[in-house]
Amino acid sequence: MGCIFGAFDDPGGRLKTRGPGTTAVHGRREGAQGPLATPIVQTSTFAFASAAEMRRYLEGDEELYLYTRYANPTVRELEEALAAVEGAEAALAVASGMAAMTTAVVSLVQGGDEVLASASLYGGTVRLLTELLPRFGVGARFLPAVDLARIDRAAGARSRVLIVESPTNPTLEVVDLAAVCASAHARGLVVIVDNTFATPLLQRPLALGADLVMHSLTKALAGHSDLVGGALAGPRARIAGARATMKILGGCLDPHAAFLVLRGLKTLHLRVPRQCENALFLARRLEGHPAVRRVLYPGLPSHPGHDVARRQMSGFGGMVTLVLAGGLPAAERFYDRLRLFARAASLGGVQSLASLPVHTSHYGLPEDKLREAGIDPGMVRLSLGVEDADDLVADVEQALAAE
């Protein structure tokens, strides 16, 4: 089966100068003849015309396909688009964000190795590092985000990988990625940056020195809370290693989900700025509210990472975390009184969502890990959608009114 989408055509390298919105809409395709919307190739396997054609596939002809777990035309189109928006040589799309993180780490470590990570990290990643990988002889150590720039002092002889998020989930700490990557590379560490909260529209970790960028496609890149997916982007050689691991682990992305992510990418540059505007508007309104002990948002000058965020990001993101003065009971009462914000896990979609980290992203983690991650029982994580800002503020203020 040949390529049905048209070849990538970029005479003179003109795409290198295109803006992020144009890149999100067009990916790396230019002047391709054929369907404007990417076809969904919903099949498990592909037929060959002859033994000679199969030999061409085995010799590396990328216009031929064998089995969707290995590669699929719709998924490959998404991978090209993801590489374009991240400024990467290549990308790999997989079944979920956790499939992406697991694939990346497993492709880089073996028994006896150690993974270093920020203490403020998504709960699923923490469980991967503390519950699953130790069964196979891979250790993990967690360091405060503020200490990561000195990772060269913390790394040991067994250390192989560093995992960071910026902004972090859900505390919204900002990591100086350029400084951290330089320090990590001084000790030979491979740096994986979870860029889910920032999106490639606001932050380009590869340009700041990261080796691999990871995304939960479920979130802002797809943008509509209707699919689950994940991705890695980076140098071609590292993505090839991750792809070989994915083929064994089996976490391939469904072609229909790939189509939906492609559609979501086309409006990324329209959705994310609106979410950033809504988040900043809400954060400013709530700073100083008597029922709110802290407002965590990198766009506020009071945020400790504000200056770093201004330097390495083009916007501050659509996530705001509140720490309520009354602890978990107050957070649960506030949560129950919300009307516009959906009470749901996940983030980054067009609809605004509210979650309690101790009950969702970090549920079940031991107390010491919660403390290390800076998780307060009174935290409420808000994912701002694209609704009218005044309506969102009114909803939050009415939910806080009784506190």
Segments (PLM) and residue ranges:
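Conserved C-terminal alpha-helix-loop-beta "cap" of PLP-dependent enzymes
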Residues: 30, 294-380, 384
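Acidic-histidine catalytic/liganding microenvironments
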Residues: 85, 286-290, 338
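Short amphipathic alpha-helical segments
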Residues: 63, 89, 228, 257, ...
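Conserved PLP-enzyme active-site core in the AAT-like
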Residues: 15, 24-29, 90-289, 296, ...
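Conserved N-terminal alpha-helix of the aminotransferase class I/II PLP-enzyme fold
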Residues: 50-99, 124-131
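PLP-dependent enzyme catalytic core of the Aspartate aminotransferase-like
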Residues: 3-13, 130, 139, 336, ...
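Short, acidic Gly/Pro/Ser/Thr-rich loop/turn segments
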Residues: 32, 47-51, 239-240, 327-330, ...
